[in-house]
């Protein structure tokens, strides 16, 4: 199966089928037939439906990343994330019905939910990068998971937002990002407090050891 044209056909076929049927009912033979490829060719490129979904999400990532405005660098981290994530909702717009079907299926299928969470977390790492926020290491993973939670909560609003300007989605996204910003600030304050306590405890511990040694008592 040639790339990337045929892969695009498979992705579009999956999203079309998900819009027409419950996602649980979409089978690999149905997908191959809709995409106009053989089942063997489908297997050559994908492990299953979730892999095709991951390809769709990757395409959305690429579209959002390609459209990032350099002027965003002048805005606050929250404002940059708002712009990036809202662009992401706009990129998803043609497939809203399909996404609704997938979300419903994930609520019934914990395995699907876990696989999607992994894919979305990776995607959110790229969205953080697009907003100029580090997504590497343990802190980066924490940020990506947190942003994934924000994304999931706002998506519930977006799926039912019929306003052309997505006013409810914008309001929900702004609210959730402000909440996340407060959590990050609280965590940073806690980290500073712990570091200060650690530094102040070291001299006291050293003094205790010196006193014990002077008295001939091992610690």
Spans of model-derived segments:
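Short, basic, alpha-helical segments at the C-terminal edge of helix-turn-helix-like DNA-binding modules
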Residues: 57-64, 72
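Short amphipathic alpha-helical elements of helix-turn-helix/winged-helix folds
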Residues: 13-17, 91
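Amphipathic alpha-helical packing segments from all-alpha helical-bundle domains
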Residues: 110-133, 141-155, 171
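C-terminal peripheral helix-coil segments that are non-catalytic and often amphipathic
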Residues: 160-219
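Inter-helical turn/loop segments and adjacent helix faces that build the functional surface
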Residues: 133-138, 157-167
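Helix-turn-helix
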Residues: 9, 17-55, 59
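Short, Lys/Arg-enriched anionic-surface-contact patches
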Residues: 1-10
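Hydrophobic alpha-helical connector segments
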Residues: 69-101, 108, 118-119
